[in-house]
């Protein structure tokens, strides 16, 4: 759980809340009671989750921003999406990426950053840098969660007037269906 306050609020831990799927998962799987990131910084941690490699190997050694082009997920890094896609799975990425440095590659305004307000942080990830993830609905680091924006698979920008976690869950359900 990302918030330790709510970690005990599941049925299998005795809480009265109904969590039948999590309860079944806890019975049938291994429950880890503690986890530690060996690099608890946004971009490097995301790079490790995607690639299974330490930051020094995957290229994401610092938080990704335009002033740090050396910190970005290597194009030749084999990531989980590459592996699953090569095995025939349909792969999606929905939400914040923050593992690729921003460049002047705005699909709607070529030669410009995607954000005039925060060009050093926000990013559009072109298809060749998506590591086997064929369905795309993501952004770099635009943390206005009540009014987020995303780029879809084709590079179209979507400005949303909905809390980002709720919207991303809706997009995930839409993708799965």
Locations of the language-model features?
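Formylglycine-dependent sulfatase
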Residues: 1-177
């Amino acid at each position: 759980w990302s918030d330790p306050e709510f970690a005990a609020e599941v049925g299998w831990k005795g809480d009265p809340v109904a969590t039948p799927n999590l309860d079944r998962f806890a019975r049938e799987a291994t429950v880890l009671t503690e986890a530690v990131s060996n690099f608890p910084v946004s971009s490097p941690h995301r790079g490790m989750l995607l690639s299974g490699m330490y930051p020094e190997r995957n290229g994401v050694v610092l938080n990704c921003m335009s002033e740090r082009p050396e910190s970005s997920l290597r194009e030749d890094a084999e990531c989980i999406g590459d592996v699953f896609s090569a095995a025939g799975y349909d792969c999606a990425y929905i939400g914040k990426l923050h593992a690729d440095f921003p460049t002047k590659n705005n699909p709607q305004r070529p030669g410009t950053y995607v954000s005039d307000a925060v060009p050093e942080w926000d990013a559009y990830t072109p298809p060749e840098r998506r590591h086997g993830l064929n369905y795309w609905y993501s952004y770099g680091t635009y943390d206005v969660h009540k009014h987020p924006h995303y780029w879809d698979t084709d590079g179209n920008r979507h400005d949303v007037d909905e809390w980002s976690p709720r919207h991303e869950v809706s997009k995930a359900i839409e993708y799965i269906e």
